[in-house]
């Protein structure tokens, strides 16, 4: 009898015992950051800064133009390079994509080639303000149907009963297969793969993992039941209830709007526990901004990086880029003026190049964590939008984010004192 039990244990897949994603086989987690390679853009004449010094150009590899894309994506460490590598792999048989926007020519070409080879493709995109009746059709996605009409399905979601934007950022390779690949990011499938400042997270894991099955659930629920918030919640929860694997402890996933409250609770818990918080976001308001106000009142050290659109929206008292002056004034009043250690990435507002990262790093007395994902740190991201958020404690991933944050804060970002006095774009 004992021999029989031992034999059964040996035959049982190691994955049935996994409680961490890193326990599953295979496991690979590769965080990549766009870190664009850009020309030096000089001012016509040197510009005076707030502290009275002068600068001759915008910060190199921070301020970029579309002409810089080719060099940026040619590197094998570029997120776009890795996306195309995944799409083009001979073992890729089916792809799920969910994004707010989709326009990358290089990725579109790779997807077309894949479809021509027989790869099935399902895409979910935001459909604009009247998605159900008159969706705004995406030219790049619709064009892919010409590569294989019966293999490409495009679904438009968002801005219907109880819902905001379809703002997920997910690519899934071979959903439901023995081995699956999941990509989640701050960036859209646009210049977010190249010259925006973004994070892209590439994971290879077992199809048996909760993580893999949950991502399959969310995209299929968006396609099949994403017409209203209630229908989506019912479908997603029903699908997840059938997953036999436990949710992993080293990477927890939250899908808004269903899991928004749980995600906020996790961030609040981590913020209160942390001895240092380092964060960056494109938009920042609502419950998370209120949490940071409290943490500042509690004398919690916080470092924060914003797009310089926020800085200029306050200085010029007008909306700049994709940020609003109302939001910017509130960030200054409630956070920056109360001691939040803030710097800015000087991006190119003329071409809507963005600091589009949204992540927080929590340093605890022992270990640390990263909170990241698709959504901005706003009320809508946790209550209305389709979003995917993650709380990660895998040491190697936390270390990678710490290293990148140091690069941003110490080398690439500009303090308020060093910002140009006048609004000049070379």
Q: Where would I find each of the regions flagged by the language model?
A:
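Sec/Tat signal peptide C-region and signal peptidase I cleavage site
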Residues: 14-18
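Sec-dependent N-terminal signal peptides
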Residues: 4-13
